[in-house]
Structures are given as structure tokens and as C-alpha cells.
Amino acid sequence: GLGDVYKRQLQSCGPNVDLSMLDKYEKTLFNCTLENRNLLGEAKLELNKKYLDHDRIGFLLNQHHSILRDHLNISTPKIEAMIDSANEAGAVGCKINGSGGGGCMFAYAPGNASSVADAIESVGGKAFLINADVGTKIVTS
């Protein structure tokens, strides 16, 4: 089960790690940190592929948001309304971002951004469309 996974991950940290001193909340934080690390590793592998699996990226975003919402209590009713609306409109993944209390989230909606933006605005959000690019590069003539 999940407890066995965490135990193996903890053992991989080294022989001197002992979680017995942690209280329930601290253990939750520790486990969430490990789970988030694993999701990040999976996302990195996916993002480095020649052909991106948008559904997989969306799934990983949703998983990360679930950890933040369900285990760390980092979300708000407004964020949840925007995420629900975005998902219903066709987003493949959504998550809160920033500090969590400011009402900021993003939706991953390749090929469907306008409909998802409209859905976010329909529940009181302010939507901005952004596009990812390769980033800064050196151009030589």
C-alpha cells in the first residue's frame, strides 16, 4: 500500500532517518513532500519527451492540486469553483498556484483555451490566455 511506498522512500533517504518524532501533521507534510517530488519527476520525464502527452500532464497537475487541497488545505471555494468550471469546459488539468490564498489558479487546456477561459470568468474568475515558448535563446548572425 501507500504506507509501504513511503517507507521505501524514507529508507532511500539514509539509515539515520527516523520519523517517530514527527506529529501527525508533520508526517502528512513529509508524505506530501515525497508525493509532490514524485509527481515532479514524472512531469519532468513527460516534458522531456519529443511528443507531449497532454492528458498525462493534466493528470499530474490534477494530482498535485489534490494533494494541496485535500492534505495541506491549500485552496479556497473560489479556486475550486474556477477549477470545476474549467474542467467541465474541457481543461485537461488545473491547479492552484501562488501562496494559495490569493485566488490564483491555472488551467492546462491545449486547443481549448478560449472555452476554458470563458468558463473561469463565468464563475467570477479573471482569465488570461498564455502560451508556453522555448524561452530565451542566443541568436547569432
Where are these regions (language model features)?
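Glycine-rich active-site/cofactor-binding loop and its immediate structural neighborhood
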Residues: G102-C104
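C-terminal nucleotide
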Residues: G3-G93, F106-S141
